[in-house]
Each structure stands twice: as C-alpha cells, then as structure tokens.
UniProtKB/Swiss-Prot annotation:
Keywords: Cell membrane, Endonuclease, Hydrolase, Membrane, Nuclease, RNA-binding, Transmembrane, Transmembrane helix. It comes from Desulforamulus reducens (strain ATCC BAA-1160 / DSM 100696 / MI-1) (Desulfotomaculum reducens). Endoribonuclease that initiates mRNA decay. GO terms for biological process: mRNA catabolic process. InterPro entries: HD/PDEase_dom, HD_domain, HDIG_dom, KH_dom, KH_dom_type_1, KH_dom_type_1_sf, Ribonuclease_Y, RNase_Y_N. This is Ribonuclease Y. Residues 202-265 form the KH domain. PROSITE patterns: HD, KH_TYPE_1. Residues 328-421 form the HD domain.
Amino acid sequence: MEFQIILVVIISALVGLVIGFFIRKNIAEGKITSAEAQAKRILEEAEKNAEGKKREAIVMAKEEVLKLRNEMEREIRDRRNELQRLERRLLQKEETLDRKMDSMEKKEESLSRKEADIENTKAELTNVLNRQLAELERVSGLSSEEARQILLNDVEKELQHDMAVMIKDFENRAKEEADKKARDIISSAIQRCAADHVAEATVAVIPLPNDEMKGRIIGREGRNIRAFETLTGIDLIIDDTPEAVILSGFDPIRREVARLALERLISDGRIHPARIEEMVEKAQKDVEVQIREAGEQATFETGVHGLHPELVKLLGRLKFRTSYGQNVLKHSIEVCHLAGLMAAELGIDVKLAKRAGLLHDIGKAVDHEVEGPHVAIGVNLCQKYKESPEVIHAIAAHHGDEEPRTIEAVLVQAADAISAARPGARRETLESYIKRLQKLEEIAGTFEGVEKSFAIQAGREIRIMVKPDKIDDLAAIRLVRDIAKKIENELDYPGQIKVIIIRETRYVEYAK
C-alpha cells in the first residue's frame, strides 16, 4: 500500500515536471518571440530616427556653410574697402610729397642763386678791404701785422690794468672780511674761555702754630735750617713776621717739596737733620704723585684722550713750571680751550686743535734737563711718543720757527698769543730773574763731579753738592774757583755771588 502511494507520488512528480517543462518552454518561447519583435521594432525606429537626424545634420551643415560664406564675403568686402581707402591716402601723400619736392627744388635753386650773389659780394668786399688796407698801410707807414700787434698790446695793457684793479679790490674786500671774521672768532673764543689765573709768585708762606717753632726750625747753631736748605735747594726765610716763615725759590717743584716737608715737620714736631731728610724724601714722592694726577686732571678737563702715559706725566710737570710768571699747565689748558673754540667756529677738526694746543709747550717740562729750545724738545718728545704729524707741526710752528701749513697750527699760534697777552698773565722781570737763576745752576752743572746745585738767596749764593768719590778737598778748592770764574765770564748779575761747595761723606753701620 505504501509502495503504491510512493509510486503515485513519484508518477505525479514526474508528470508535474513534464508539464512544468512544457509550460516553461512555452513561456520562454513567448518571451523570445516578444523580445525579437520588440528588437525589430526598436531597430526600425532607430533607422527612422537616424535618417531624420542625418537629414537635420545636413540641413544644419548647409546653413553653417552659408553663414560662413556670408561672413567671409562681408570681411573680404570690408578689407577691399579699407585697401581702397589706404590707396587713396597713399595717392594723396604722394601728391603732397611731389608738391613739396617741387617747392624744395625751387628753394634750392633760389639759395644757389643767393649763394652765388653772396660769393660775388664777398669777393668785392675782399677787394675793397685789401685796397683800404693797402691805403692805410701807405698812410700810416705800418704793416697790418705791426698795427695788429700794437692794437693787441694796447688791449693787453688795458686788460692788465683792469685786472689789477679788480684783484686789488677783491684782496681788500677779502682782507676786510677775513679780519672781521677773525675778530669775531677770537672775541667769541675769549668770551667763552674764562681764565682767572695770573702770574705766580716765587715764594710760599708757611703758617706756624707759635713763634717758638722758629727756633726749633733753625736748630742748634742753625743745623736744621742748613740741612733743610741743602736738601731742598730753597731759601727758608725766618724774619719778624709773626707765626710764619717764608720759602723762596724759583723752581716750583723744589718749592712744593720744601712746603710739604716743612708743613709735615711742623705738624710732627720732631725737627732734626735726619727727620728733615726723611720728610724731604716723602715730599718728593708725594710731588711725583701730584704731577701724575695733575696731568690726568688736565686731560680730563680738556677732553683730550689717548695720550701716551709719559706725555700725561710731562703735562703734570708743567704744573710746576712757569713762563714769565705764568703757570705753564694752566696756560696750556687755556690754549687748548681757545684753539678748540676757534676750530669749532671755523668748522675744522676740534679734537686735533685741542690736542695740539694742550701739547704745544710740552717741551718746557724737561727744558731744565735737556739742552735746546722748548719747541724742538716738544717736537722730539711727540715724535718719540707717536703723536700725529699735524700735532707735531703745530708744536713746531707755534713760535714761528716753522711756517704754519695747516689751519690748526695757525689756531694754536693765535691761542698761544691770546693766552700770553692776557692782562696779568705774565711778568717779564720775574722771567728774566728766573732765567738768571737757572743759568747760574746750569753753569755749575757743566763741571765734572757736580751732583746737584741750588741757587739761593735770590741768586746771590749758589750751593753745589759734589760727589765725594770724584772730588777731594784739593779738587774742591780748584772747582769752586773755576765755577766762580765761569760765572763772572758768562753771567750778568748785580753785586756778587757767593759760591759754596759742599762735600759730604757718610759712613753708615748698624749696631746689632
């Protein structure tokens, strides 16, 4: 029974499959037939559309060709018209050019005729001029060249006279303007440079706490005062002046050393030859410090920098030098300021002018030790310490020993004269007195064996320290006579001069 059911099911399935196959086949064949029909219809429609588009494209192409043809014809027509217009303009220009050429030819012919007429006229004038010249030569008895030379000479003389008058007029006006400008510059510089320094004295007054100190200064039998004067070379004057003693000497350095030493001795109270010698040595060292500080202060005050240290030290020594009673350092600072002010007015190098002004008298710092004028000494010093040629030239020319070649040299010369000529700055008699004392010491220093010499008592006495190992007692007698004889022959002086030779021998031993 189950087998039959299974068989029926299988047969039913097979029949279903066969029926389904045929049904599917019929459906597929129907779809194929429908698709073929649709494809055919689409092809037919496409052929119809393609034919229409082809005809439409042909029509559009024909229209485009026609349009392009019309544009080309219009452009060709426009260009033809433009060419015709240009041809007409060219023809007009050719006609105008032809007319101008004709006119030029006519003018050229006219100019040729006029040129020929001018040549003829020139030839006639030349003939007339030659005849007149010949007649003038016959009448005057001179050739044309001689007459021309006479005329040129007359003209030259007249021109030379006129030029001389003009040159003199210009020179006078230039001198007047230069003098006025120079006066204005110098007046301005003097007004702006206020200097209150006047001539220095050759004495220093030392106050005392009481008159009893005078006896201590003199010492037993005058040994203290003799030791002091011998060591310092300065006169110590003790008179009736209450509570004061006077130091007198022409050398400011010695006078300053003596002043410092005496003030310290008075303050210390212990006054005897050994103490005096100790204080004098300390005072000398202090003066050296003062010299250096004075040089540095001078460069700071004037604004002149970059100087060699030795030049700065020499500037400081000028503080203790005088020229006709005028302090040389203050004079140099004044010249520096004046030269700088005048240089500023003229618009030239102010620093160079001030540097030359400050160093112009540097030779006076060592003129006691070195022979020769202070100008030459200053030039040598500045060359040694590598100063510029302009500064060296200004120093060499400031007293007229050399012709000034630069404006700065002229300004230093003028500033030096202004400072020296200022009322109260110098005293001629004092300078001659100091020079006589210096000469007195120089004469003593020329002899061999002399260690140092001091002119004291206003030049009426000179004390000479000799080297004991070179000068014995007999040689000292001969030496003092020789020095006195040389002073008589070479020096003019009033009255008489006392020459003293001091020969001192020291033997030192320490007790241990």
